[in-house]
C-alpha cells in the first residue's frame, strides 16, 4: 500500500524562511532569553531569527552550507524552495489551512522573513559582517563554548532518510561543544513520524554528562510539532577553564 499524501515527508532538504516569532515559539524562548549571550542558529536557512536577535541588541551567528552561495544564487534557490513549500502545504490542508489568497496562511510571513533575511545577507556579503557562516554539521568552525545558546530547527530528526544515527549524535555533540545550551525542534519528521533512534541518542548524551529534557511547545507552523529538545552542558567547576 502506498502512503497517503499527508504521510509522505517533504523530500529534499529545503532552505526555509521561518519567521523570528515562529522560532521563539518553536524553541520555547522569550526575547529576554536571546540576550543572555551569543546565539548560534544552525542551520539558519533564510530565517530572520538572527536579524531579530541583533535588532534587540544581542549577538547572533547563523550557519548553513547554503551560505557559500552568492546572494543572487541564494535568492533563486530560496524562491524555488518557497514554491516547494507552497505546493507541499497545498496538498495538506488539514495541517496547513489556507488564507484568503488560497495559499497556506503562514506563507506570507515566510515571504516577509525571506525579504528581511536577503537584505541582511546581501549586507553581510558587502560588509563582511561575519553574521552568516558557510559550514556543515557535524563540524563547526568555532572554539568551545563560543555561544550561550544554539538553536537547531527542522534539520535534525526532520530528515532521517538523509542523515543516519551517527550523524545525529555527532551533530548534537558538536553543537554542545560550541554552546552551553542547545535546543532542537521538532522531534519528528515532516510527515509527523517520531525520530526512531531518539532514545538511544539521549542515552549517549546523558552518558556524556549532558542534562536532557523536553519542552512542550505550541508550533505556529504545524500543531503536531509539540516538543522541543533541550540539552545543557554541565557547568565548569569554579576557577576552571577549557
Spell out what each predicted region is:
Residues 1-37, 48, 55-56, 68-79:
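Class I SAM-dependent methyltransferase Rossmann-like catalytic core
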Residues 55, 59-130:
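Class I S-adenosyl-L-methionine-dependent methyltransferase module
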Residues 138-151:
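A short acidic, Gly/Pro-enriched loop at the edge of an enzyme's catalytic core
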Residues 153-157, 185:
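Residues lining the SAM
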Residues 159-174:
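A short, conserved alpha-helix within the catalytic core of class I
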Residues 190-242:
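Class I S-adenosyl-L-methionine
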Amino acid at each position: 500500500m502506498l502512503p497517503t499524501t499527508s504521510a509522505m515527508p517533504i523530500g529534499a532538504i529545503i532552505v526555509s524562511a521561518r519567521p523570528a516569532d515562529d522560532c521563539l515559539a518553536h524553541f520555547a524562548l522569550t526575547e529576554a532569553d536571546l540576550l543572555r549571550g551569543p546565539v548560534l542558529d544552525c542551520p539558519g536557512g533564510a530565517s530572520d531569527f538572527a536579524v531579530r536577535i541583533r535588532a534587540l541588541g544581542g549577538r547572533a551567528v547563523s550557519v548553513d552550507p547554503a551560505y557559500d552561495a552568492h546572494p543572487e544564487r541564494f535568492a533563486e534557490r530560496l524562491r524555488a524552495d518557497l514554491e516547494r513549500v507552497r505546493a507541499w502545504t497545498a496538498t495538506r490542508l488539514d495541517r496547513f489551512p489556507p488564507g484568503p489568497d488560497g495559499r497556506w496562511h503562514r506563507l506570507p510571513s515566510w515571504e516577509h522573513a525571506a525579504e528581511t533575511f536577503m537584505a541582511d545577507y546581501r549586507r553581510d556579503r558587502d560588509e563582511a559582517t561575519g553574521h552568516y557562516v558557510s559550514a556543515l554539521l557535524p563540524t563547526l568552525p568555532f572554539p568551545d563554548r563560543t555561544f550561550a545558546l544554539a538553536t537547531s530547527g527542522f534539520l535534525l530528526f526532520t530528515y532521517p532518510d538523509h542523515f543516519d544515527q551517527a550523524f545525529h549524535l555527532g551533530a548534537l555533540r558538536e553543537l554542545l561543544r560550541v554552546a552551553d545550551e542547545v535546543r532542537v525542534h521538532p522531534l519528528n519528521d515532516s510527515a509527523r513520524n517520531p525520530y526512531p533512534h531518539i532514545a538511544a541518542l539521549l542515552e549517549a548524551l546523558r552518558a556524556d554528562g549532558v542534562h536532557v529534557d523536553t519542552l512542550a511547545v505550541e508550533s505556529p507552523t504545524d500543531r503536531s510539532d509539540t516538543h522541543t529538545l533541550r540539552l545543557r552542558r554541565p557547568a565548569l567547576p569554579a576557577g576552571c577553564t577549557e
